UniProtKB/Swiss-Prot annotation:
InterPro entries: UPF0367. Belongs to the UPF0367 family. It comes from the Bacteria. This is UPF0367 protein Pro_0144.
Length: 87
């Protein structure tokens, strides 16, 4: 399972959707990246493959960052994805 997270302006919590296949996750990630570059479409609606009725609609102008990572099964000792300043 792969997670795609959207960091929004003035929001401490990201929005996330899941994809079952790496190819699908990469395709969505690239679509979001292109939308951020172009600013078009203004409104994006994204659905989640894990939770069928989960849909989010966001204004592209409110998205700060997009990140994609593989969801791990283990809960112990895992750090949150992204960049870390730990030594």
């Amino acid at each position: 399972m792969y997670l795609i997270e959207l960091a929004l302006k003035l929001s401490p919590l990201p929005l996330s959707v899941q994809r079952k296949k790496l190819e699908d996750a990469k395709a969505l990630y690239n679509q979001l990246k292109e939308s951020l570059k172009k600013g078009d479409p203004r409104l994006l609606e994204i659905s989640c493959e894990q939770v069928e009725d989960k849909k989010i609609a966001v204004l592209v102008s409110e998205v700060l960052a997009v990140q994609m990572y593989e969801k791990t099964a283990g809960a112990g000792g895992n750090r949150r994805p992204g960049f870390s300043f730990d030594e």
